[in-house]
């Protein structure tokens, strides 16, 4: 397979780790990155180490996902430094701009794929970003790590536009949905009928809210009594109060995660047969529970069983989000170069059911 160059929109926690993990992947070269204050572009390849050093504890963003601001590219409030000097512009490779996404789009003729490491604090935010690339006649791959079920339908509504542009869009390509729906799709192959898919995840974030503001804010939207709108409007003290109220450990049940619709569109099972929950510990690196996928079904010879897949507790959220996302990116580029355009979920890139 030919070399692949790609861009990252957003240099918060996920975006920075995407750049770092890519340095361990053969055939992948990051050539552009941006956040709300600036952009870095080098078609020969970014100096990832320099960018990571420059943006450590220095992430631009406001955490509220103000998508009416054309500069918005990440979901994390300024972690340890505020102002226009935060984020990518602190890098020697960075250039200040009021329109960072437009700057990436302007370079997109020479970019194979774009990974959207962005917040989803408005349901239509990611779909609107996809539209902007399509309107610019971008031909290539878009990858996101979104979690919200209803967003998949919004992307499907735009599929014709994406196909006309020549875009292959893989949605939900992180840990959950991405890695875990892929595992569920494989586990389902033992059965002729899948009755139930249970996904239970555990994440430890010793670096806490300050270094993971966008992720934590999005997760709070899944708690009972909250939704994406209320989470978006909460100020920093309110977010911290929720964390304190739960002693730093948030438990989620029956989450609106995209795993359900992605498994349904792949023909594995009905969306209503998928349940997702988990525990987030914002004060410890250790996972509070083992991430587990359980697929229950009936085999061709009438046996009922459950296939179980677990992630080792030693693997971090960053490893389980960014490794799969870049893997799906590689697969999507193959499809795109073969002329296969449209919207795909991770399970659709696995063996068919």
Swiss-Prot record:
The modification Allysine is found at residue 147. The keyword Ribonucleoprotein does not apply. Transmembrane segments: none annotated. NAD(+) binds at residues 10-14, 214-215. Keywords: Aminotransferase, Biotin biosynthesis, NAD, NADP, Nucleotide-binding, Plasmid, Transferase. The keyword NADP applies. It catalyses: (8S)-8-amino-7-oxononanoate + L-lysyl-[protein] + CO2 = (S)-2-amino-6-oxohexanoyl-[protein] + (7R,8S)-8-amino-7-(carboxyamino)nonanoate + 2 H(+); (8S)-8-amino-7-oxononanoate + L-lysyl-[protein] + NADPH + H(+) = N(6)-[(2S,3R)-2-amino-8-carboxyoctan-3-yl]-L-lysyl-[protein] + NADP(+) + H2O; N(6)-[(2S,3R)-2-amino-8-carboxyoctan-3-yl]-L-lysyl-[protein] + CO2 + NADP(+) + H2O = (S)-2-amino-6-oxohexanoyl-[protein] + (7R,8S)-8-amino-7-(carboxyamino)nonanoate + NADPH + 3 H(+); (8S)-8-amino-7-oxononanoate + L-lysyl-[protein] + NADH + H(+) = N(6)-[(2S,3R)-2-amino-8-carboxyoctan-3-yl]-L-lysyl-[protein] + NAD(+) + H2O. One of its GO terms (biological process) is biotin biosynthetic process. Its EC number is 2.6.1.121. Signal peptide: none annotated. The active site is at 147 (nucleophile), 218 (proton acceptor), 222 (proton donor and proton acceptor). InterPro entries: BioU-like (IPR044262), NAD(P)-bd_dom_sf (IPR036291). Pathway: Cofactor biosynthesis; biotin biosynthesis. It is an enzyme of class 2 (transferase). GO terms for molecular function: NAD binding; NADP binding; transaminase activity. Belongs to the BioU family. Monomer. In cannonical biotin synthesis a pimeloyl-conjugate is transformed into biotin by the subsequent action of BioF, BioA, BioD and BioB. This enzyme replaces BioA and performs the first half-reaction of BioD. A 'suicide' enzyme that participates in biotin synthesis. Catalyzes the formation of (S)-8-amino-7-oxononanoate (DAN-carbamic acid) from (7R,8S)-8-amino-7-(carboxyamino)nonanoate (DAN), a function equivalent to the cannonical BioA reaction and the first half-reaction of BioD. The cellular requirement for biotin is thought be low enough that this single turnover enzyme supplies a sufficient amount of the cofactor. This is (S)-8-amino-7-oxononanoate synthase BioU. It comes from Haloferax mediterranei (strain ATCC 33500 / DSM 1411 / JCM 8866 / NBRC 14739 / NCIMB 2177 / R-4). The lineage of its organism: Archaea, Methanobacteriati, Methanobacteriota, Stenosarchaea group, Halobacteria.
């Amino acid at each position: 397979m030919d070399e692949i160059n790609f861009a990252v929109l957003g240099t918060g926690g996920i975006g920075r780790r995407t750049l770092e993990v890519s340095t361990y992947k053969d055939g992948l070269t990051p050539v552009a990155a941006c956040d709300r204050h600036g952009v870095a572009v080098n078609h020969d390849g970014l100096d990832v180490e320099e960018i990571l050093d420059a943006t450590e504890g220095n992430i631009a963003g406001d955490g509220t996902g103000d998508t009416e601001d054309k500069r918005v590219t990440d979901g994390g409030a300024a972690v340890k430094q505020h102002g226009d000097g935060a984020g990518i512009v602190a890098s020697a490779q960075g250039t200040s701009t009021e329109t960072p996404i437009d700057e990436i789009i302007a370079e997109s003729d020479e970019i194979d794929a774009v990974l959207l490491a962005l917040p989803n604090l408005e349901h239509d935010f990611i779909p609107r970003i996809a539209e902007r690339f399509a309107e610019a006649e971008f031909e290539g791959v878009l990858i996101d790590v979104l979690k919200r079920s209803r967003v998949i339908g919004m992307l499907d509504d735009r599929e014709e536009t994406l196909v006309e542009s020549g875009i292959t869009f893989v949605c939900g390509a992180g840990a959950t949905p991405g890695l875990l729906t892929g595992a569920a799709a494989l586990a389902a192959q033992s059965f002729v009928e899948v009755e139930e898919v249970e996904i239970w995840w555990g994440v430890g974030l010793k670096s806490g809210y300050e270094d993971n503001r966008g992720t934590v804010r999005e997760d709070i939207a899944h708690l009972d009594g909250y939704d994406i709108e209320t989470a978006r409007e909460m100020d920093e003290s309110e977010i911290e109060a929720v964390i304190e109220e739960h002693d730093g450990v948030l438990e989620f049940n029956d989450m609106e995660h995209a795993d359900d619709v992605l498994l349904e569109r792949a023909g594995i099972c009905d969306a209503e047969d998928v349940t997702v929950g988990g525990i987030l510990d914002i004060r410890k690196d250790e996972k509070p529970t083992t991430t587990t996928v359980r697929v229950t079904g009936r085999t061709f010879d009438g046996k009922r069983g459950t296939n179980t897949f677990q992630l080792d507790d030693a693997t971090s959220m960053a490893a389980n989000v960014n490794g799969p996302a870049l893997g799906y990116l590689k697969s999507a580029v193959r499809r795109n170069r073969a002329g296969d355009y449209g919207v795909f979920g991770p399970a659709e890139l696995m063996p068919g059911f």
